[in-house]
Amino acid sequence: MHVLLVGNYEPDRQESMRRFVDCLLRELPRHGVNVELVRPTVWFGRRRIGGGLDKWLAYLDKYVLFPPVLRRRIQRAPSGSIVHVGDHSNSVYLRDDLEPRQIVTCHDLLAVRGALGEPTDCPASPAGKLLQRAILRGLQRAGLVVCDSTATENDFRRLTGGRRRSQVVRLGLNGPFRRLGLKETRAGLASLGSVLLDRPFLVLVGSSLRRKNREFALHLLARLKPRWPGLLVFAGEGLSKSQQALRDALDVGDRVIVVQRPSHEVLEALYNQAHALLYPSRFEGFGWPIIEAQACGCPVVCSNTTSLPEVAGNGALIRDVDDEEGFVADILSLHDRARREALVRSGYENVKRFQPERMIADYVAAYRSLATP
């Protein structure tokens, strides 16, 4: 079986999409699948003009230069090859004449929903609205749409009228996250100084996008400040200007640490040392940090929105996304050793559902279903 795997444009720096594609490239050959990666070449995108024009140069690479390249690669591929678009935002590359042999992974439809006027904290410009509509049309040219979660599949069926074939294949862990010993944890945190070894902290992993709800986390920290001596670590992107302003207005600057683009070793150590993963997102398609934390024995406190309850299972304390006092109560409750240990055990049990081997086996079965006349 031959699969032509369509990857992302590298300058877009879509880390979660890169990790997903890397997992497929690494694991599929072990299941007898020959995988060939193809993605847009950076040509016009090498130039830096500024003034908002860089995005349009990238569009030339992605939407003008790449489609004929992909078409030629498909023509040269072995007969019966499957075309797998690894990120739904690239569904614009799907073709009507190849529908039965095209599969696309839909990680979420938040941007599409935002472009259609739904409240997802994903506003779209006029050009963005056109692109998101093109993405939705592209999804409907696939022979099979694989969604990361039931929540995302429900969105897909609703937006397309349930006319296209779809199924759920939940993501697997994207790295070897595990419980570390004290020595390994200290080594992983060494580059961040001693403060994270001396004081308890919550870790919030992800970008600074509005839907990640960092502002809510800062308000939680302000509520916790007189009752708990801990810190809040933002791992991922730096704080936006508005988030910095809110941090200062709430007078919690001395309690906030930002770790930008942590390595796997640093992130794993953060999970191992943290009082809990705080994950109050308003909208998600999956929620990888939840299972990463659970695999490391880190308690999880998260919101009850979109895919998060489905992913967290019984291994998290789950609250309404606007329930500040409830989140505070759950965070403080983890001082109870028995409650904490029970939650950690439930997390270990839950993460068994998300082994990469299971995800890969499901994708191989999906490929075979398309390859069979």
Language model feature labels by segment:
Residues 1-373:
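Carbohydrate transferase catalytic cores enriched for Leloir-type hexosyltransferases
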